[in-house]
Amino acid sequence: METREHRLKRLKIRAWRRGTKEMDLIFGSFVNRKLEELDAAELDSLEALMAENDTDIYPWFTGQSKVPPAHREILQKIQGEIKLF
């Protein structure tokens, strides 16, 4: 079983190595600030969101398309921490 410490390291690396620079900055900035504070359920949500394609995620962040219900809570948490514009 993966330890919390290993999981956090894996998520941090994954956050900074996305498919697009925009998503690197969004996810990377968020995990640098808040990753240690997330509980197991929030980490699950973050991991599920990060499993989506960047081309789908970016429009959710910018409000160009509707966010799937499964990702709303974690996306709102990230948006509360990151200023896009």
Model-derived segments and spans:
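Positively charged, polar, low-complexity stretches
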Residues: 2-85
